[in-house]
């Protein structure tokens, strides 16, 4: 089993637990260059809110899109958009990534902006 397969296995276990909770999920995905965040509905079919470093609004504020500063901006924007739609409580789905670095920064900034998880 390689590193990617192990991460996907962790992500599947987490998603099974969150599916049983029947909660709105804040899902993140991290690549070498970008970070993506989506808030997905309880029925796992609709993306309610999304933000990523590929958006012009966010990437224009940054010199690089692959650092903690970029993750913090994505966390702030996803939280603001969610609150605007009336979403305050979410479950955090880190997609098998370690809660460290950019993932932690995104989560912390989303909490500071007003999301609860």
From Swiss-Prot:
This is one of the proteins that bind and probably mediate the attachment of the 5S RNA into the large ribosomal subunit, where it forms part of the central protuberance. Part of the 50S ribosomal subunit; part of the 5S rRNA/L5/L18/L25 subcomplex. Contacts the 5S and 23S rRNAs. It comes from the Bacteria. This is Large ribosomal subunit protein uL18. Gene3D superfamilies: 3.30.420.100. InterPro entries: Ribosomal_uL18_bac-type (IPR004389), Ribosomal_uL18_bac/euk (IPR005484). Keywords: Ribonucleoprotein, Ribosomal protein, RNA-binding, rRNA-binding. It comes from Blochmanniella pennsylvanica (strain BPEN). Coiled coil: none annotated. HAMAP family: Ribosomal_uL18_B. GO terms for cellular component: cytosolic large ribosomal subunit. GO terms for molecular function: 5S rRNA binding; structural constituent of ribosome. One of its GO terms (biological process) is translation. Belongs to the universal ribosomal protein uL18 family.
């Amino acid at each position: 089993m390689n590193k990617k397969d192990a991460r996907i296995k962790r992500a599947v276990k987490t998603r099974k637990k969150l599916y049983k909770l029947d909660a709105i999920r804040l899902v993140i995905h991290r690549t070498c260059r970008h970070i993506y965040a989506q808030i997905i509905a309880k029925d796992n079919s609709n993306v309610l809110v999304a933000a990523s470093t590929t958006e012009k609004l966010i990437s224009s504020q940054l010199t690089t899109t692959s650092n903690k500063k970029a993750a913090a901006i994505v966390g702030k924007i996803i939280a603001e958009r969610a609150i605007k739609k009336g979403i305050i409580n979410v479950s955090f789905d880190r997609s098998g990534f370690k809660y460290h670095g950019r993932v932690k920064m995104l989560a912390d900034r989303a909490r500071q902006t007003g999301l609860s998880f």
